[in-house]
Amino acid sequence: MKIGIIAAMEEELVLLVNKLDEPKTENFGQFTYHTGRINGVEVALFLCGIGKVNAAVGATLLLDKFKPDYLINTGVAGAFPGNINIGDIVVSSEVRHYDADATAFDYEMGQIPQMPAAYQADKLLLGLAKKAWINEDSISVHQGPVLSGDSFIHTPQQISQIEQKFPDVMAVEMEGAAIAQTGFLFNVPFILIRSISDKVHEDGSSAIYEQSMEKAAANSVRMVLSMLKEL
């Protein structure tokens, strides 16, 4: 079994790179790609950059070059519900674009025309995540809908618009839906594992993000490593 793991930022990937046995590194244009084994599992680690276009291009390269059986997106996210705290993990039940609007043509809000409205996380990967969070009892884990778009959500207007359109949202980030859509197009199952770096309703969320990002990224990596141990 081959697992592709993709992240937007070096801080979200470096701890996994450091765990690689028999590591190899390649560059494709401005993208960096590492292969090797973690706990005996063949993996490829891909640094895609921030935002949905970078994520889609990176995921496409990862799928084409490595041909993984499963795709995991690791990284950080902002939390919507007040009971989700900095450093907690959110496992995607589904992921949607929040910044796509083709409702004039009877598509759902967030739905790209001719694509699903929501991309469902793979059941096998969800099962691995559930086993992993039992083992990682020092981290609180939540499962629910995740939204993606090309903005850092922090203003009252942004927050209100998202909550009106997607009242069940648990976390928001900038790459997951593009990665999920790419996986859908290539028939490769996926899951998002995101740790909370900021809470969108708190003042100064960008400063909180800067302070918390490395800790949150490390927690997300811990969860992914626990999942790999379950394979």
From Swiss-Prot:
GO terms for cellular component: cytosol. Substrate binds at G78, I153, M174, E175. Pathway: Amino-acid biosynthesis; L-methionine biosynthesis via salvage pathway; S-methyl-5-thio-alpha-D-ribose 1-phosphate from S-methyl-5'-thioadenosine (hydrolase route): step 1/2. Its EC number is 3.2.2.9. It is an enzyme of class 3 (hydrolase). The active site is at E12, D198. InterPro entries: MTA_SAH_Nsdase, Nucleoside_phosphorylase_d, Nucleoside_phosphorylase_sf. The keyword Hydrolase applies. PANTHER family: 5'-METHYLTHIOADENOSINE/S-ADENOSYLHOMOCYSTEINE NUCLEOSIDASE, 5'-METHYLTHIOADENOSINE_S-ADENOSYLHOMOCYSTEINE NUCLEOSIDASE. Belongs to the PNP/UDP phosphorylase family. MtnN subfamily. This is 5'-methylthioadenosine/S-adenosylhomocysteine nucleosidase. It comes from Maridesulfovibrio salexigens (strain ATCC 14822 / DSM 2638 / NCIMB 8403 / VKM B-1763) (Desulfovibrio salexigens).
